[in-house]
Amino acid sequence: MRELKIFSGRANHDLAEKLCRHLHLKPARITLGQFPDGENYCKLDEDVRGRDVFLVQPTCPPVNDNLIELLTMIDCCKRASAERITAVIPYFGYARQDRKDEGRVPITAKLVANLITRAGADRVLTMDLHAAQIQGFFDVPVDHLYAAPVINDHFVSRRFAGDEVVVVSPDEGSIKRALGHTKRLGGNLAIVDKRRTNALEVRQNTIIGGPVEGKVALMFDDMISTAGSICGAARLVHEAGAKEIHIACTHGVLCGPAIERLREAPIDSITVTDTIPVTGEKLLPNLVQLSVAPLLAEAIKRIHHDQSISELFRER
């Protein structure tokens, strides 16, 4: 069987090292950097001819830098005669630009999928895409994993399950995700009726379902970016009498005013995974980071051995 090689870009080296430890491997050696004019530089420091190569690189902020680095890594491995190249993209940037919601705008998620495919990726492994239909933008197989089992197990271990909890969907678009969590955690479902006045301004109105008074409210989303929506929803739930509020997401983008908003919001804990590094001021006292490395490592092992990974596709 062809040898397995795992290379890491600079976007999330810690995650790559964790999943390598789970596979009892060392990260393959690669030199990455920039020329004085800002152009990316990539050189493989070991042979990949005939190897099964996995490139770990989320396209998180700085999105364009990390995307270009991923593309150069793919091209580098292709030209070095790797037998198969799998792009492991724990967080897929540009996923929110998956359709034309107004005239004269691009579908950038499709463009990025084309770039990754044309660069030479034979397969993509990703997690919690903002829009599941992005899988269809690729002309190569896409394995789409979910972090919900990892997050649910965390809340069960904290005894946040059963009749004392209410799972709150922060908007209509998250109802399916919230329903999945209620099946695992129990409790009732509540929905924040969110009315968006424009692309930047969100106004929360009412809570449908519940009840939330006296309950431990759990709120889930695929990502927290500027945190405006989820913090607004948390305030509404707090005003409705929830005794505790805990929020969780797969991708902690946490950009712009997110940290300030999360500090000021009536939120008891924030749970994210390590698809994106969380460092510096983002390490709030009430922030918990879970690892998806075991899940990704198992998927990589099964792909390498040409085994089924369908049982890893659980949304809950």
From Swiss-Prot:
Involved in the biosynthesis of the central metabolite phospho-alpha-D-ribosyl-1-pyrophosphate (PRPP) via the transfer of pyrophosphoryl group from ATP to 1-hydroxyl of ribose-5-phosphate (Rib-5-P). It catalyses: D-ribose 5-phosphate + ATP = 5-phospho-alpha-D-ribose 1-diphosphate + AMP + H(+). Its EC number is 2.7.6.1. It comes from the Bacteria. Pathway: Metabolic intermediate biosynthesis; 5-phospho-alpha-D-ribose 1-diphosphate biosynthesis; 5-phospho-alpha-D-ribose 1-diphosphate from D-ribose 5-phosphate (route I): step 1/1. ATP binds at D37, G38, E39, R96, Q97. The keyword Cell membrane does not apply. One of its GO terms (molecular function) is magnesium ion binding. Homohexamer. This is Ribose-phosphate pyrophosphokinase. Keywords: ATP-binding, Cytoplasm, Kinase, Magnesium, Metal-binding, Nucleotide biosynthesis, Nucleotide-binding, Transferase. One of its GO terms (cellular component) is ribose phosphate diphosphokinase complex. Its cofactor is Mg(2+). Mg(2+) 2 binds at D171. PANTHER family: RIBOSE-PHOSPHATE DIPHOSPHOKINASE FAMILY MEMBER, RIBOSE-PHOSPHATE PYROPHOSPHOKINASE 1, CHLOROPLASTIC. Mg(2+) 1 binds at H130. The active site is at K194. Belongs to the ribose-phosphate pyrophosphokinase family. Class I subfamily. The keyword Protein biosynthesis does not apply. D-ribose 5-phosphate binds at R196, D221. One of its GO terms (biological process) is ribonucleoside monophosphate biosynthetic process. It is found in: Cytoplasm.
